[in-house]
UniProtKB/Swiss-Prot annotation:
Organism in which the protein naturally occurs: Rattus norvegicus (Rat)
Sites of Phosphoserine modification: 53, 65, 76, 106, 166, 184
HAMAP family tied to this protein: ATP_synth_alpha_bact (MF_01346)
Keyword Translocase: no
Post-translational modification, as annotated: Acetylated on lysine residues. BLOC1S1 is required for acetylation.
Transit peptide residues according to the UniProt entry: 1-43
This protein's name: ATP synthase F(1) complex subunit alpha, mitochondrial
Sites of Phosphothreonine modification: 134
Biological process terms in GO annotation: ATP biosynthetic process; cellular response to dexamethasone stimulus; cellular response to nitric oxide; lipid metabolic process; negative regulation of endothelial cell proliferation; positive regulation of blood vessel endothelial cell migration; proton motive force-driven ATP synthesis; proton motive force-driven mitochondrial ATP synthesis
PTM annotation (Omega-N-methylarginine): residues: 204
Keywords of this entry: Acetylation, ATP synthesis, ATP-binding, Cell membrane, CF(1), Glycoprotein, Hydrogen ion transport, Ion transport, Magnesium, Membrane, Metal-binding, Methylation, Mitochondrion, Mitochondrion inner membrane, Nucleotide-binding, Phosphoprotein, Transit peptide, Transport
Site positions (Required for activity): 413
Residues that coordinate or bind ATP: 215, 217-220, 473, 475
One Gene Ontology cellular component: cell surface
Length: 553
């Protein structure tokens, strides 16, 4: 009888004003209710049993779910930083949305407020605006659909070709692979640049720093490397293909546009993704862009493919991070950078790896770029990144203006793991070249003080001048590895010692044309064998000797 009592109690509690009673509240028998007396009369007529069943049905069928959304309010806004009160359960690096539609990322989680960096123009936000959580850590689209596209740091297309069609998304701040999934670097990553492939070889899965002052050709090395991959990506062997991601941080829009045009003209955009956070973009986007590009590259790595990512340049990312940290009131350290600026770069570059076969056998190779001030490699950020990476290519302004391009300082440039990945053919011809060039630079400094030099020193100087000339290379003209081997062979075996240094470049051009047109089988053998056999050595010797005999510069 409990249900009957409940029904009677509800009837007694009905509001006296008829307008407050819903038509559907207690069934069709209450539609005409006007006051408490009328409702009691109808209740007696309908019967308490029927009333209780209607009430039970209504109670059981009620939807008790509540859609709760955690929101906060903007306490202050300025310089791209919003202080938000009320987001008590927000996660670190979670995406939040302002009432204006702008997105931001929570970075400082403090007891009474949250420090949010704004992805865009903070003039659209004002004090008191509502901020809501999205529940998602910052992520970007990844996949083959991004190839050939130019996107911003959040993965939105900015090339005017419509939205990116990828349905797969990946968090930007993923943890680097551990020790067990990795394997040592063992496959070569050909740049097509003689000086790099012979002296500082790079392997797939390596991190090789490109460092130098402004206007010394750092970006040119990176772009040449991308263009050189066309010869592998045009083939059918998936294991040889190398997908490229170029991350432009803090550069001019015109520079990025020229770069995209250059890659398009070279037919290299079809296997390249360009991630752009230009100088006019907000500092949080410049900070985020390298991580976004890295996630796109990791998609290929984790699917058994090979990828190359270029960060151009990480100095500007560090400056953007310093700006954000100081505005978030984090304590400054050396050169006003925050204490975790080393971790900023180490957690990014550690994600480049060569995976073992049980994890797909893919790789992600990183070429970070750092700009120095007046050649000072002992500054804070350069020393940090040098200690993280597996070697560096050091470019010098002095060499650049002497016409030695690429302007690589052989003495300071090193590859710590790349020699294991270098092809045997290149090792055979370039094994002693780095030592000879380093000795030449050392002796050349003393040679200008006097001319009384012994024959061995004069021979060293003579060979060094010719090898330096031989390693010069034009921009956007990468060479296949077998062509490099043929040219360097002529230099290190002493066939060019009697040729005037000024005629070396002309010799190289004519010799390459001759070998490519007349001796394609020899180049094919070097390419397929990966080494110079005795037959190939004898053939090369014969070709060089005969060509020099009839060479007229």
């Amino acid at each position: 009888m409990l249900s009957v009592r409940i029904a009677a109690a509800v009837a007694r509690a009905l509001p006296r004003r008829a307008g407050l009673v819903s038509k559907n509240a207690l069934g069709s028998s209450f539609v005409g209710t006007r006051n408490l007396h009328a409702s009691n009369t109808r209740l007696q007529k309908t019967g308490t049993a029927e009333m209780s069943s209607i009430l039970e049905e209504r109670i059981l069928g009620a939807d008790t779910s509540v859609d709760l959304e955690e929101t906060g309010r903007v306490l202050s806004i300025g310089d791209g930083i919003a202080r938000v009160h009320g987001l008590r359960n927000v996660q670190a690096e979670e995406m939040v949305e302002f009432s204006s539609g702008l997105k931001g990322m929570s970075l400082n989680l403090e007891p009474d407020n949250v420090g949010v960096v704004v992805f865009g123009n903070d003039k659209l936000i004002k004090e008191g605006d509502i901020v809501k959580r999205t529940g998602a850590i910052v992520d970007v689209p990844v996949g083959d659909e991004l190839l050939g596209r130019v996107v911003d740091a959040l993965g939105n297309a900015i090339d005017g070709k419509g939205p990116v069609g990828s349905k797969i998304r990946r968090r930007v701040g993923l943890k680097a692979p551990g020790i067990i999934p990795r394997i040592s670097v063992r496959e070569p990553m050909q740049t097509g640049i003689k000086a790099v492939d012979s002296l500082v070889p790079i392997g797939r899965g390596q991190r090789e720093l490109i460092i130098g002052d402004r206007q010394t050709g750092k970006t040119s090395i990176a772009i040449d490397t991308i263009i050189n991959q066309k010869r592998f990506n045009d083939g059918t062997d998936e294991k040889k293909k190398l997908y490229c991601i170029y991350v432009a941080i803090g550069q001019k829009r015109s520079t990025v546009a020229q770069l995209v045009k250059r890659l398009t003209d070279a037919d290299a955009m079809k296997y390249t993704i360009v991630v752009s956070a230009t100088a006019s973009d907000a500092a949080p986007l410049q900070y985020l862009a390298p991580y976004s590009g890295c996630s796109m590259g990791e998609y290929f790595r984790d699917n058994g493919k090979h990828a190359l990512i270029i960060y151009d340049d990480l100095s500007k990312q560090a400056v953007a991070y310093r700006q954000m940290s100081l505005l978030l009131r984090r304590p400054p350290g050396r050169e006003a950078y925050p204490g975790d600026v080393f971790y900023l770069h180490s957690r990014l570059l550690e994600r480049a790896a060569k995976m073992n076969d049980s994890f797909g056998g893919g790789s992600l190779t990183a070429l970070p770029v750092i700009e120095t001030q007046a050649g000072d490699v002992s500054a804070y950020i350069p020393t940090n990144v040098i200690s993280i990476t597996d070697g560096q290519i050091f470019l010098e302004t002095e060499l650049f203006y002497k016409g030695i391009r690429p302007a690589i300082n052989v003495g300071l440039s090193v590859s710590r793991v790349g020699s294991a990945a270098q092809t045997r053919a290149m090792k055979q011809v370039a094994g002693t070249m780095k030592l000879e060039l380093a000795q030449y630079r050392e002796v050349a400094a003393f040679a200008q003080f006097g001319s009384d030099l012994d024959a061995a020193t004069q021979q060293l100087l003579s060979r060094g001048v010719r090898l330096t000339e031989l390693l010069k290379q034009g921009q956007y003209s990468p060479m296949a590895i077998e062509e490099q081997v043929a040219v360097i062979y002529a230099g290190v075996r002493g066939y060019l010692d009697k040729l005037e240094p000024s005629k070396i470049t002309k010799f190289e051009s004519a010799f390459l044309s001759h070998v490519v047109s007349q001796h394609q089988s020899l180049l094919g053998n070097i390419r397929s064998d990966g080494k110079i056999s005795e037959q190939s050595d004898a053939k090369l010797k014969e070709i060089v000797t005969n060509f020099l005999a009839g060479f007229e510069p």
